[in-house]
């Protein structure tokens, strides 16, 4: 805008200057430059790429960029990070001369992102190639911290450690590699070399046998193990003035190792003299390292540590193709097998897992992050709470110091001199705590060089003595611990020795940066400033000396000397120093006491005094109960004005002892027993004791516990800390109780310094546990389950104590308290501990229980301060009408401690018991914990506070109990699912009570949808309250009321709705006592949990799915369904035990029983049918029981109903229950033989139903009430006028309902048929309810004018004028008959209206319409009735199907557009639904009637389709299964009737139609023929069983007359398969089977006779035949002879046998001694082949049936035929004596082949030729083999595929003994 204004400015004469580019434009320019640099790098133009990337780093916008936090996603810092990484790549490509620049780039990049393991890998690789093994090791270790599974860093670190020579670390890394890859060859080799102890003497051992080697690492100076001795020999042969050593890394440990290796006599360097000057060469010059550090400090700003590590956006924007991160396993195992690599990659975890926990970050810092703001401001020191790490030097600074020392001491006299200088240098320059390894090396070097000719300076001796003493504080740190004090004594003695020799003490202060020489010291002798310095340093030196001497005296148990030494030290520190500053002496190299002050010395002196008092005075005072005096005596000594950190706790063999700890324990006991309690001293005691224990455990140190430390000792210290934390909790409870009793709750209950100090120490405890235990679950998953329970408990106790300490301050706001609980909950949840731990009562979830109690007390306090009723409601659904007293009562019930048993854990002394009692009192009065002081806040702040409390409560209850009241989605923030969130498995009844009281207000105010959310919780509670107490169940008044057989329902039903009915039925419910007495008994039996019992079951019943209709069909019929119904009803019955007058429970219970009856009958009608229902009596019993219980529940509901609508509804339900018992429906009744008996019970139910419908109608006039009353009037036999008037009233109340219209005119039809055509009164009544008004007028006119039955006619008859009387009576009869027809047609017309249009599926009216037509009996009425009802049983696709649909009153049909008769334009629609059982009943009733109509109309085809369709119908086959035989009987009856009518007309029976159908029916349904013949619908002479079987024999005879061999074979096979089971056979069916077999046999004989050649053979022909068959003269041929007795049979009708004989005798009479020389003629070959197969089937399948034995077969010579010698017994004639089936098979075989063989040969041939051919392309037809003359050659058999076993010993029957035909 400014530029535009400047351009448009025409008046200004000055030239405008453009503005600077925006920050976004500059960032874009830098991104583009970075992109160009990447392209140049990709193109290998390294110089240009270097120029571009350096320009990015030098840009001012990059150098001046600042961010607040490291997590801030800053584009510029991403760009800077990537530029540094790629610039390092450029330097690497430029060569080794640029390696230092690349190193600097990597160091700067690491400052930006220290979590990039790939970057650490590059840095380590580069520094290794430069010889910087220390930096390389550091880099690879940091890379593993970032990514613990990084193979690159792991393997490279192993090689660097080999190069360094660190054997212990090398073995650890090798084991780490083997844990991830057990077959790693290099790691196995390294581990074997290090652990190998069997090497030869004087040979390299352990790590000395290894050389570093890695494909991607370069080592500048590899150790030559094999050439080492040769080099040493070479150096020993010539004099050398200086020995050079290569320092692998610039560290104290490396330098000390070289010196020790020279001076130690057992080292391999024994050949080198320790007095030869040595030169130490560094791998990298000090200048380069220092320069790199300076460059780093110059380039990297203070905000560089805040750079975000996310660089993916830069990569996308720049579009560069340079890959920023290399793969973890890239080219690391070139010789690895593919299968091994795949397995390794499959088991590899994603890289993200390595970054989930930042190992470089102290995990305990989260404690301060969460809780720092909640520590009271006074006395809180962040360093004391969370930052406990001693300052140690980093590798780079140590590298610089070591390098400086080496450079300064190049001129030396050998190893001894170098070691002496080194010890002096460290003693003066040490400003940090030395590592353990460095300290041990220093002490070892000191021992080796102790007796060198030059003495140590006193400062050096004092330094060494302090170092030895510091190690003695942890005796387990060094193997020779007892010798430490000897060494301390030695060095102190050396100091005295040097002083006694007047050795000038070097006064150079240890804190200065340079070391003074002797000459420089002398130059300061005359200067005043130097004198002051000398005075201070001298005092400092001797103060340190006397302090150490005092400590040594205490260890020697010389306390007097120790006191003397302390006083001397105090005198030195007490003198005035330089200026006014307090005297402070630094001891930076010591771990424990790092500084000496006056307060420290005074504290130690006080401890000596306390020790004296504990040994002499205190025990006697405690014994005499002088508790206050003890407190006054010890408190000033233990608690001086300024607090002192503890120095030591003495460790003995028996355990841990300390004078201070002993004094504190005595003082604590005295405070507990003194009256009143000195709160400040009491709390200070616990604060100081916890402080001493924490410092004794070493929690203030960051040094890793060495491997040689004693685990038992550490555990004992931790146990003491945990016990003290528990004691602090008891202390807080006692202090609170004491202050509450004194009435000082309005003031500060404890000193803020004391409270803040304990809070800081508790934070320290929590931080220590997090640092040393909980962090392991992230860094080492194997230890995730190894966290000790004591650590968890201690952590939780510390958190609870921290929170309770805050509550002691009355000035803390309520919001502050709630926020602290929320923070602590989040913190505990982070480590999965929010639900862990046990409180004093042994209940799980100690913190959550404490939090819930406090939050509910706070909530009550806040709500009581709100005057408006709107403020009372919880956000989770408390009703607005809930008053303040109810809220208070609810909260108190939740918070009252239920467990009064405090004897679960025995106390060690009386004081602990007293503390437990007071804590119990405090827990019972939690609601008083909130101070009366209430802040004046705005209404909005109160609402916000309320919401905060509710959210905290919701989360606590969700974690502890699994409660989630927020599933409705109305809350913005969902509840967090923590690691150990409860799933609602409550362990005790007390837990259930707490939860239930919490949710009760919400549940009462919720709808069913809200209760569904609580279903899981309510179920969990019910596990502990599964049923009421046993004494209530034993005398269960509800069950007795529901099942009492002596209860008179009729009386109750009569009194229902009257005044006093509730009292009457209550007496029936509780007969022996009053309602008040019953409630008192409930209180006595369920007192502790009465509220739970009183509400649980009702709420659970409302939340559960109590309706079985939602289950799968038929569910209620199963055992599971019965149990489901019982469980649901039990819930309401249990509730009614405690709330006997709850209307909702009675009503719902009655509905459940009614629904069970409905489902039982509906599902029973569909899934069991009538027959199955009769077999299961238990189902009928369930129906009757549920009906009775439903009626009684509804009667009780009626007594409790208040409004008229409720009473009307209950009356209607009761009436329907009674009415349902009256209906003749399935599955109780089958509409055929089983019908309801209209006995006294039936009549009583009718009357009760009528009564309740009448009462319901009086409350609310509903058309259905009048409708049912009309039907009941008909059942009770009331006058026609009453029932029709009810229907008329129903039609008036609901003009659109079709139900009353249908029922009105259906009843009129029934009455017209029942009363007859001459009942004047009935006709008059029926005429008044005509559908058509014109017919009504006509009928009434005729009835009014008729003379039939009038008084005048009767008078004439009395006077004797009979002829006139008869004439007038006949005329009246005709008129009445006309009226009857008019009314009948009117009713039919009305029913026709009920099935028009969209009401076409209103099947009730259609059935009544068909019934009316059928009963009218007109000429075409039968056909019309069938056509009308056929709508329900046919469709456009099928001639018979059940085309009916269940009437549903909920779905309103469309309105008719066509007006009805007489202008009736009412739009009728269905209003009453139809039950499934009623629908199935209608189907059955209509089906029976429709089958009758089909039979009477002789519709055979539809009947045939009917019974087939009924069996296969998927929907209704089971429902109408018992009606299928009825349909078959109707079908058979129709067939028989049809044949009888044809026979009477003289026609011939057609076996292919009716007879064939009867036979097919016999095959399919023959087993039920006896039942069919005895059905009432089919019983008659024409359908008797014998008559039906006669038709079967006729069918067989017809087939035999027509010689249908194939058909006879088929029916034989069907009969054999159908009746092979003896149970399905009877005498009639057996006769049919024998007849069919005989007919098949005779048909085969006739067919064979028809194709057998009959021409005679002359002698010439006979002789001519012989040569053609191989010139054999004895060839025999088959001769066939049939006898005349062929047609005689014992079970056939003689007339039928005569018919067969007359037809086939001429054919069979020709077969007399016929010789078969050749096969049949060509035209009959196919027939012969078919007959051969049929004979073979007859041979296989024919059972033991008596067959005609008049078939004779012979073998004869051809020459005997002309001579007439073919007689049995003659020479050359052999009789074939086999069975008839075998004879037929031989006969057919001979006709087909022209020759005959043995029976076994024929059978074998048939077996092989009737099997399927397996060979591809083989023909399926039989091949007739060529037969040579005389029969010597047999047919070649086909390949045998399947073995077939032929019965009747087929191979045993031979045809003769002729050799020409072998078997």
Curated annotation (Swiss-Prot):
Q: Where is the composition biased (Basic and acidic residues)?
A: 894-923
User: Oligomeric state and partners?
Assistant: Component of the HIRA complex made of UBN1, UBN2, ASF1A, CABIN1 and HIRA.
What are the subcellular locations of this protein?
Nucleus
* Polar residues: compositionally biased ranges: 1818-1832
Main localization of the protein described in the UniProt heading: nucleus
Q: When this gene is knocked out, what is seen?
A: No visible phenotype. The double mutant hira-1 cabin1-2 has aborted and fewer viable seeds.
TPR repeat start-end pairs: 30-65, 81-116, 118-150, 543-576, 602-637, 866-900, 955-988, 990-1009, 1011-1031, 1143-1183, 1226-1263, 1264-1297, 1306-1339, 1377-1412, 1508-1541
Question: Under what name is this protein listed?
Answer: Calcineurin-binding protein 1
Entry's PROSITE patterns? TPR_REGION (PS50293)
An example Gene Ontology biological process: chromatin organization
Which keywords accompany this UniProt record? Chromatin regulator, Nucleus, Repeat, TPR repeat
Per the record, the gene is CABIN1
Which residue spans adopt a coiled-coil conformation according to this UniProt entry? none
Give the domain of life: Eukaryota
Tissues of expression: Expressed at low levels in seedlings.
